[in-house]
């Protein structure tokens, strides 16, 4: 079975906790704080692998978590960073945030990587909090939790040439004759329900990858037939070979079929309508093909190269393969492949925090304050006092008062709730 969609959960490693330790050594009076920092959590990284062809591995395992950072220790020993978790995906995989639909990465080249969940920062040890007013702090930060999210993975095959056309036009038979691909072939519509890849080798030593795309029908751009499931696989190809049932053996008109298929490609993605293509006038061994070939040449011969072929007998396939190979030499290798895309680092201007009231609870939002809260050891009185100073310094307390907070009201910051005391 061919799997070209998957949904997975990824979580970066949590940062290690900072350490509270005091230096106690002979001949070292007033040793002072000596607690080391926690290590950073590992990142979750997706890496494109040209040797993979489907997303089937994600059918059996959907949750991935990187290693957390080690905790800090005494003697100012910092914890080791967590190891990154590298997940291999097929080249051509598009990565999106499942919740927002945001495009995170488009991994199109072998070895290309994208960080999809960053590890949390390690907490600072008590040695970091020495001030002239507090020479012996007995508090440390907890490690920051790693990023977590659900991802939608979508594979768009990477092939040089795409075979397109109506069902039963002979695409699968053609690819089986010019390559070692062995797709299922039968005389009923939609025999091919998954894309097939084959390497076509030319006598002069050149080769290219050909993809047999399941048959398209009118309305495919709206999802009719196999529609959206496989139209996206055509997007990566550099050249299209339009396979037509020239004999009209299925009761269709090849001249009209060509128009319909090209219209569907353009409606799905306008760039596909401009993609270079040649016509493989197939089934020339059947009655009626010669007459329709003449009509095709009259209608499209001035704009497209037309090759009379028979995938069954092999007629004309050598000339088609040689010409396709020559055309690929003229088309840049990356012409249909987008520039490598990875989630950019965005610095958003705006307020450091927000304050609002919902159902009697005061909600404080903001990445900075939420990080301070989650990294504070709320069981440590000294750490809580530091958090209160941060809240006042950021202006959050003043904003809460302006919002009408009273003694005993509940304040929620991230996943934590506090009681406001004047």
Curated annotation (Swiss-Prot):
GTP binds at residues 165-172, 190-194, 212-215, 282-285, 310-312. It is an enzyme of class 3 (hydrolase). One of its GO terms (biological process) is ribosome biogenesis. Keywords: Cytoplasm, GTP-binding, Hydrolase, Magnesium, Metal-binding, Nucleotide-binding. Mg(2+) binds at residues 172, 192. Transmembrane segments: none annotated. GO terms for molecular function: GTP binding; GTPase activity; magnesium ion binding. Its cofactor is Mg(2+). It is found in: Cytoplasm. Residues 1-158 form the Obg domain. Residues 159-329 form the OBG-type G domain. CDD domains: Obg (cd01898). InterPro entries: G_OBG, GTP-bd, GTP-bd_Obg/CgtA, GTP-bd_prot_GTP1/OBG_C_sf, GTP1-OBG_CS, GTP1_OBG_dom, GTP1_OBG_dom_sf, OBG_GTPase. Residues 337-422 form the OCT domain. Monomer. HAMAP family: GTPase_Obg. An essential GTPase which binds GTP, GDP and possibly (p)ppGpp with moderate affinity, with high nucleotide exchange rates and a fairly low GTP hydrolysis rate. Plays a role in control of the cell cycle, stress response, ribosome biogenesis and in those bacteria that undergo differentiation, in morphogenesis control. NCBIfam families: Obg_CgtA (TIGR02729), Obg_CgtA_exten (TIGR03595), PRK12296.1 (NF008954), PRK12297.1 (NF008955), PRK12299.1 (NF008956). Belongs to the TRAFAC class OBG-HflX-like GTPase superfamily. OBG GTPase family. This is GTPase Obg. It comes from Pelotomaculum thermopropionicum (strain DSM 13744 / JCM 10971 / SI). The lineage of its organism: Bacteria, Bacillati, Bacillota, Clostridia, Eubacteriales.
